[in-house]
Amino acid sequence: MNEKIAVIGGGQMGSQIAALAAMAGYKTNIYDENKENLEYRYKFVEENIKNLIHKKIYSEDKLNSYKENLGLNYSLEDVI
C-alpha cells in the first residue's frame, strides 16, 4: 500500500484511529505535542492488542503491523 495517513491528536480517539490504520497496513503518522501522553497511548494500545492476541481475537501479525506502520511525531511539520 502506498497510502499514508496522518492523525492529528494522540488522545483516546486519535490513538485508536491511528492504531486501526496501522494494523490495516497503512503507513500512519500520529502527531501530538504532548510527548508523554502520546507515548502512554502507544503503550496502552500495544497492551490492548496483546490482550486481544491472548484471547485469540487478533493474530500476532496485527501487533507487528502496528509497530512497523505507526510513527509517533511531536512536530506537526513532520507529519504533513
What are these regions (language model features)?
Residues N51-I80:
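A structured beta-alpha segment of the ubiquitous adenosine-cofactor-binding alpha/beta core
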